[in-house]
């Protein structure tokens, strides 16, 4: 039975882009908050807290949020903490929100060594404190992706309001023995491979990405667009909307001839895909035997569908989530020479019992977190 949280309003974008067939690439990118992977954790939270929860965009004026009759605002979060983003504007708005607030899935972004803690902009520090001041008494009301992000909260004096739970998308599939299903699938022949595409400007991954593009070709696989705008435009074949420099970099990232734009355009037409509904995304993943790429949520949705996957953990946000949730991963240096169909399986380091035990542990902690915030749930 689905839970009823009549006292809850979600501050987030929708879980799906219903009018995706009618949108151009730029509008698709805007609809998913600049990364379609965001749909994974928004869908998870929506499913876990109940059907048809009222929803208000985070960017709405505080007066609009306050006009909703619910007493608790739940905010699905991404990797907001870091030098890359100043949350001053949102902190100013949240200071005027007259509700208890709960953040789910907050992450910090830094280099993959996760030793140095970022010096947050003052606006982001204020943002954290606005959440901390709107907790349910002493109960933690900020779920974070892992111990690294928790240390960032500690640096700014709000660690008592945080708890490390990974990402709610870990619990989309209700199967308590999901790990064994993934392990069994990993024993099957690898015929088709899906790759959640990296950002074409991530030069440190270009050598790996070239090999993944070749892997897609060799297995009649697919190259899934998640971010940025230009990749959705390429998926839509809106090449006249993509500047020449970006097209050049897109070609270099895949090892395609820089001057032969027709070759690049044909490749994207043949292999690119994009999905804007999470159940449809997971169902699509079942058409493939393996998934590998630098997008944690692209890999996560495959795993939730029972399809083996490997995340290329190239920064703190991906590494932290993989380590917290026992998601199979490699570092870029591990596959510096690239990946082929014949070597792919050798990089899949996965213990189904450890994975299932970690899911159970985090599910129990997640349930306690939700209960502490007065939220009913289905996990």
Regions found by a protein language model. Name each.
Residues 1-379:
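Active-site anion-handling motifs in enzyme catalytic cores
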């Amino acid at each position: 039975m689905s839970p009823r949280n009549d006292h809850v309003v979600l501050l987030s974008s929708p879980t799906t882009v219903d009018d995706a067939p009618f949108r151009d690439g730029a509008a698709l990118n805007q609809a998913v908050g600049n990364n379609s992977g965001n749909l994974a954790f928004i869908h998870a939270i929506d499913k876990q807290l109940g059907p048809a929860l009222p929803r208000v965009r985070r960017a709405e004026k505080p007066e609009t949020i306050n006009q909703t009759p619910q007493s608790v605002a739940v905010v699905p979060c991404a990797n907001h903490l870091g030098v890359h983003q100043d949350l001053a504007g949102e902190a100013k708005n949240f200071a005027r929100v007259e509700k208890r607030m709960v953040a789910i899935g907050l992450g910090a972004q830094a280099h993959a060594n996760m030793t140095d803690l970022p010096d947050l902009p003052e606006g982001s520090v204020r943002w954290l404190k606005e959440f901390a001041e709107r907790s349910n008494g002493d109960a933690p009301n900020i779920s974070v992706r892992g111990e690294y992000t928790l240390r960032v909260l500690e640096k700014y004096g709000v660690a008592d309001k945080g708890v490390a739970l990974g990402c709610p998308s870990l619990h989309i599939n209700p199967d308590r023995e999901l790990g064994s299903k993934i392990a069994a699938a990993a024993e099957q022949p690898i015929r088709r491979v899906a790759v959640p595409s990296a950002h074409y400007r991530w030069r440190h991954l270009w050598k790996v990405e070239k090999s993944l593009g070749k892997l897609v070709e060799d297995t009649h696989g697919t190259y899934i667009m998640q971010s940025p705008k230009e990749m959705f435009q390429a998926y839509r074949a809106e090449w006249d909307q993509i500047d020449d420099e970006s097209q050049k970099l897109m070609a270099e990232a895949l090892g395609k001839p820089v001057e032969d734009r027709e070759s690049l355009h044909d490749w994207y037409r043949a292999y690119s895909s994009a999905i804007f509904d999470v159940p449809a995304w997971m169902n699509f993943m079942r058409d493939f035997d393996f998934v590998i790429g630098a997008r944690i949520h692209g890999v996560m949705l495959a795993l939730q569908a029972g399809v083996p996957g490997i995340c290329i953990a190239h920064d703190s946000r991906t590494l932290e989530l993989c380590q917290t949730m026992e998601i199979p991963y490699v570092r870029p240096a591990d596959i510096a020479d690239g990946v082929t169909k014949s070597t792919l399986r050798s990089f899949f380091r996965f213990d189904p019992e450890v994975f299932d035990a970690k899911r159970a542990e985090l599910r129990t902690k997640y349930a306690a977190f939700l209960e502490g915030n007065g939220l009913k749930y289905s996990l």
